[in-house]
């Protein structure tokens, strides 16, 4: 059953009142396909229908596009943080075997890379993100073993211990280091007394 022009226009008006713009556009499309010249009211209904149909899709597209851009930026930042962490790791490994001025340079490079990774991870990652936890572990090892600094213990002691599957192993390693280093420090204090 095909509707005549006046029924389709009435259907479009009802669809507009119900804010069903896809139905409104379909009704007005059917009016135009009949081949008759459109009145001002019909042209207005057609315009309103398509403006709202397209507007809703444009709005949805903007939201999706914005989310994609934020996600891409976040992924790039996380990747950058991971790469700085790796750079810090490799310079730390070099500083373990270097000597003299070369050791100072590798220690400095390692610390700079870890610090960059740390700043990025604070802004871009959750506290329990595996990369951020791995960074905390390796940076604390750097402080304790390379710089011989007790700051590593204080840093590890402030970590939040939420249980996330990917983070559990790293958090256990952090806890093991804290226990080991605390017992070593207590042993050193006992020897001094």
UniProtKB/Swiss-Prot annotation:
The modification N-acetylmethionine is found at residue 1. The modification Phosphoserine is found at residues 60, 149, 183. It holds the Pfam family 14-3-3. Keywords: Acetylation, Cytoplasm, Isopeptide bond, Nitration, Phosphoprotein, Ubl conjugation. The modification N-acetylthreonine is found at residue 2. The modification Phosphothreonine is found at residue 2. Adapter protein implicated in the regulation of a large spectrum of both general and specialized signaling pathways. Binds to a large number of partners, usually by recognition of a phosphoserine or phosphothreonine motif. Binding generally results in the modulation of the activity of the binding partner. Negative regulator of osteogenesis. Blocks the nuclear translocation of the phosphorylated form (by AKT1) of SRPK2 and antagonizes its stimulatory effect on cyclin D1 expression resulting in blockage of neuronal apoptosis elicited by SRPK2. Homodimer. Interacts with SAMSN1 and PRKCE. Interacts with AKAP13. Interacts with SSH1 and TORC2/CRTC2. Interacts with ABL1; the interaction results in cytoplasmic location of ABL1 and inhibition of cABL-mediated apoptosis. Interacts with ROR2 (dimer); the interaction results in phosphorylation of YWHAB on tyrosine residues. Interacts with GAB2. Interacts with YAP1 (phosphorylated form). Interacts with the phosphorylated (by AKT1) form of SRPK2. Interacts with PKA-phosphorylated AANAT. Interacts with MYO1C. Interacts with SIRT2. Interacts with the 'Thr-369' phosphorylated form of DAPK2. This is 14-3-3 protein beta/alpha. It comes from Ovis aries (Sheep).
